Amino acid sequence: MTAIAPTKLNRQQILGFWAAWSGWTLDGMDSVIYALVLSPALKELLPQSGMANGPADIAFAGSILFALFLMGWGLSFLWGPIADRFGRTKCLAASILIFSVFTGAAALSQNVWELALFRFLAGIGIGGEWAMAGTYVAEAWPEDRRKQGAGYL
């Protein structure tokens, strides 16, 4: 009996995988960095927004910011029809760009309201990236390699 060799991946499939993997990696890195800088950032931003900056105030504001981020992420269902119309590759790139731009903008926030807006918009980008990355790899990779691609991702 001879073993069937797995289908070779082309350049586009490999690059698409690495784009999806990089997006997911940046998402994870963002979460870690955000957790590390949130308390010191809110200690400075809350007074600039006319709010107290005690421990309970920081915890409350941090919870609201996280909820807004998750609400943006929850809008990921909107990316499906957009990707069907314009293509997964373009939409995956757009979602990573949106996430990256608004994460960078969040670092430049002058008050808590700007931070809230930028985190919400970054959540929309990350939601699209999470929704489309796995789908893109599943659709772009050959059928006999899809499980492997999903496992690597």
Which residues make up each language-model segment?
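Transmembrane-helix signature of 12-pass secondary carriers
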Residues: M1-L153
